[in-house]
Amino acid sequence: PTISKIIGKDFTEYGVSVVNVRGTGLRRFAKILQRADAGETLDIRVSCMTDRDVMPNCAPAICIDQRYSDIALWPEKEKRNWKAECDFISQNERDLYLERILERANGQRVKTFVANHWTFEYDLAYAGLADELIEAIVAVRYESKNREQRIKDIQKKCEEFPDNESKSAYLYSFFSLKGTSKAEVAQHLSFILETKYASDPKALCERLPPYIRDAINYVTEQEDA
């Protein structure tokens, strides 16, 4: 809700509610808002946001186990609960994987928006909000007297990585390896974004992952007369 408010699409004004379905699953939630008879479609636009759940190839070593810097040491696909980009042998296979995600909830006025790269937090960092994410992570993990130095330390560590993928994966490792609460980080991130971008919504919009912008736009679009 904070992001939508900052970029001038306040969910409250549009009558939009946010629901975290968590373990319920998109498909079950979407079915509540879909009708068996297409002629009785509910006149309610619904955006379902979900992770892509495909790691960049660098992420297993950064976010799971350092040994996985050698792909030969990865467990067989059938014996692990994660996927990486190199698991797909063709673009067609990637496209089919994405289609299956979309099919879980798409239909009638319900539309699914899948993370452009991996997860919500990773995509925020990848798209341009890495510094804000660092600040939020530090606010959750460290006492106020240590935060300024911790931010510098993490930023310096990020500079050691060769590309945006590995830098963003490193920031995600604070959740996957170090147990940082995503919910608490989200709360702090909301405050940080509002403080930094309330007077410059265009700058925030430019730094948002495209799928988040699209999901917000879909539920706040004005209907044609």
Residue positions per predicted region:
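Acidic, divalent-metal-binding catalytic cores of TOPRIM
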Residues: 1-225
